[in-house]
Amino acid sequence: LMEHAADPDTLVHEWAESVIGDQYPVPDRILHFTELIVQDYLAQEMCDRRPPKGTFDLFATEGGTAAMCYVFDSLQENFLLNQGDSIALMIPVFTPYIEIPELRRYQFDVTEISADQMTPDGLHTWQYKDEDIDKLKNPQIKALFITNPSNPPSYALSKETTERIINIVKNDNPNLMIITDDVYGTFIPHFRSLMAELPHNTLCVYSFSKYFGATGWRTAVIALHEDNIYDKMIARLSEEQKAILNKRYSSLDLHPEKMKFIDRMVADSRQIALNHTAGLSLPQQMQMSLFSAFALLDKEDRYKAKMQEIIHRRLHALWDNTGFTLVEDPLRAGYYSEIDMLVWAKKFYGDDFVAYLQKTYNPLDVVFRLANETSLVLLNGGGFAGPKWSVRCLLYTSPSPRDVEESR
């Protein structure tokens, strides 16, 4: 904060009020010093310490799930996405990204882009084919929703796929809105979000829950570059649509037409009328500041290295007993592991057994039998629009034998 020439008295006043929690958040979008700290944190963790020019405006939210709700709501309220519009969804993906577009309010026409690339020996790479990414060239597709690294495969976009998306935006679909959920980015060495590569098109949702093991704190931010296509597209709406929006936000600003999209999200999150009580609670913002400051002061990234080492240790503890060789992949976060049971069945028992398995059993039989007989709870990958016979294993909360031994 001293690098930002912060006034010490003003800083201490904000922090003292945040600890006490005696006020509504002012500014409502995010507290002043919280925004400065989190901006630096995102530049370090989401942009690999090489942020694009300009500033990202932040909106502090009650976890990533609230951020998702606010994004979908405000995109529609501001006519950026209308009922029945075409969007693209990169799958497998966190289930609500599948279910929300299906709601009657939205009923979006969804183009699924599946991470179905395979190695020559039949293993999943969880990356995307060029011809599928090229679907984004269609200007009818207004928005792309992505979780990066993915959930549940837990892989980051390859450099080739990222560059292909960049070229498509620059040459074919310049108004493509990209909504990226990057909660697992800190588990990838030198991770760079699409917010770093395509800042004008990308709206980033980042939650502190996974990296800091603090899901119960409900701390997240929506990040949107100060120079973005969302504001520009609102400015190009029809006169009728502008009139509707001006009336909607007229109680908040003498010139509602000048309101930024991210500020409209804040107001929308409280049905406009309760905008004066909007924002994440002061204690939650204080905790968010502490998380960010902790990472920023860890100049050698010791915490990050330890978290990544724990994940990889557990990943190998899982896979070393499967009969498969887990090839090292710098794009693998490892927070989850998605295991395709049909790949296993084919490798060890052949095609005839695969056919028998599919004919005789249901994919859910695997997870229910594991739960009943071993008390091991996994999720079926089909619910994430992944392979029907895959299962998702959560490694971050699944201690390896070494973890148990070290805890004694």
Predicted ranges, named:
Residues E3-H4, G21-V26, M118-Q127, P153-K159, ...:
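Short, flexible/disordered intra-domain loops and linkers
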Residues A5-N173, G185-P199, L203:
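Conserved core of the PLP fold type I
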Residues E328-Y335, I339, Y356-R392:
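Conserved PLP cofactor-binding pocket of PLP-dependent enzymes
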Residues A243-I310, L315-L318:
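Structural motif of enzymes handling amino- and sulfur-group chemistry
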Residues M195-K260:
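Active-site PLP attachment segment
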Residues Y396-D403:
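Conserved small/polar residues in nucleotide/adenosyl-binding loops
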Residues Q287, F294, D301-W319, L326-V354:
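Conserved glycine-rich beta-strand-loop-beta hairpin in the small C-terminal domain of fold type I
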